[in-house]
Amino acid sequence: MEGITHPIPRTVEEVFSDFRGRRAGLIKALTNDMVKFYQTCDPEKENLCLYGLPNETWEVNLPVEEVPPELPEPALGINFARDGMQEKDWVSLVAVHSDSWLLSVAFYFGARFGFGKNERKRLFQMINELPTIFEVVSGNAKQSKDLSVNNNNSKSKPSGVKSRQSESLSKVAKMSSPPPKEEEEEEDESEDESEDDEQGAVCGACGDNYGTDEFWICCDACEKWFHGKCVKITPAKAEHIKHYKCPTCSNKRARP
């Protein structure tokens, strides 16, 4: 996406400078320029990507046409999930994917120019000194740093990160299969009811029956169940959704 206007970084310092510039551009898109960024990510458009540029700017554009691309590509289709999630959750999801993309670009340069073990380690240490984009946009940058210090001082104390991860995984597990009709009175009865519900569940988009090996998600507005693939929601996206609305319910809300 950047064309030939930006010099190719070749040393650890140059790669880190490139990383820092792209990171600054992405943070700007998700904070100061949030209104413009949100409006640019129109779900009616084709698959869009958020690019951070080395000169601390950003752009939303279609992915490059060349295959394979010159540089690793950022997450594709960020605009599709915009109206199906709360704005805060959507921004957090874009931030997580942006963090992943920044690392892939930095270590792509490292591999391309033959960085050795010590150079890769130094690059990672320099990058790791900076808060992630997700930490910045969620306001957890300072809290995360303090947590890291506390963990280093006392290994016996459990990490808060682990508990948050467990909560997220638990949430996805609950979303992946239809729940029982009501709170169960006894274990045996709850198992029977759960099996009946799963067998009778139908996707609100395609009409197919529930399958145990498929990811499902329920709309909090109409309470219909959908295949994740039918509404373009993955388990990773579901972790960041507090109140999911299907495309139909989202469109109803958008109409004046």
UniProtKB/Swiss-Prot annotation:
GO molecular function, one term: zinc ion binding
GO biological process: cellular response to phosphate starvation; chromatin organization; regulation of DNA-templated transcription; root hair elongation
Main location: nucleus
Domain of life: Eukaryota
Family matches, as Pfam families: Alfin (PF12165), PHD (PF00628)
Compositionally biased residues, Acidic residues: 182-199
Keyword Transcription: yes
UniProt keyword annotations, A-Z: Chromatin regulator, Metal-binding, Nucleus, Transcription, Transcription regulation, Zinc, Zinc-finger
GO cellular component: nucleus
SMART domains for this protein: PHD
ZnF bounds (PHD-type): 200-252
Tissue spec: Ubiquitously expressed.
S-S bonds: none
Localization, UniProt: Nucleus
Compositionally biased tracts (Low complexity): 146-163
Site (Histone H3K4me3 binding): residue numbering on this chain: 210, 216, 220, 225
Gene3D superfamilies xrefs: Zinc/RING finger domain, C3HC4 (zinc finger) (3.30.40.10)
Family membership: Belongs to the Alfin family.
Its biological purpose: Histone-binding component that specifically recognizes H3 tails trimethylated on 'Lys-4' (H3K4me3), which mark transcription start sites of virtually all active genes.
Subunit structure: Interacts with H3K4me3 and to a lesser extent with H3K4me2.
UniProt note: domains: The PHD-type zinc finger mediates the binding to H3K4me3.
Protein name: PHD finger protein ALFIN-LIKE 6
Gene: AL6
